[in-house]
Amino acid sequence: MRHRYRIAAVVGTAATVLGGLAAPASAYYGPEGCPPQYWRAHQGNWQEYRPDSRVSNAWHMTNLPLAERQLTFAQALADPGRTATTSRTLLRSAVASYLNAAHEGVLYPYRRFSAPYYLRISISDAIASGDTGYMREVIRDLDRANNLPCPLH
């Protein structure tokens, strides 16, 4: 069974739906995002979250290894390396997406807790699924948004 997507991306002025759930063009917030390495290096620019915030408080993740559940946001932003689990790589992308969506100065295309994007639900669903293919799709979409032009540089 294929998972339904709730994530969409904005490219230029046209909305591109990734995975099938469309929203009116007026609902898209903007084509900006900052990558994980930006957020790791500029912790003073974080809004609504702190470096010691735990990833386990942001997403339902009982099926993850204990070491991953105990990561702080700052730790999750570290490059996990080529041998990292898919879930660990997802946590890095997810933390960056939350920091982008929370920042008033970033016109990020996804929202954390509201329609039509529901980052929290999309990320929690991917983690809970245990399906590495599904997690990779979410990682790809989050990374695409996280690597849009960063207005905070």
Question: How does the language model describe each region?
Answer:
Residues G12-A14:
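Hydrophobic helical h-region of N-terminal Sec-dependent signal peptides
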Residues M1-V10:
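Bacterial N-terminal signal peptides that target proteins for export
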Residues H3-R4, A25-A27:
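Extended, helix-rich scaffolding/adaptor regions
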Residues Y28-H153:
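Soluble extracellular-acting proteins and domains
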Residues V17-A25:
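C-terminal segment of classical bacterial N-terminal signal peptides
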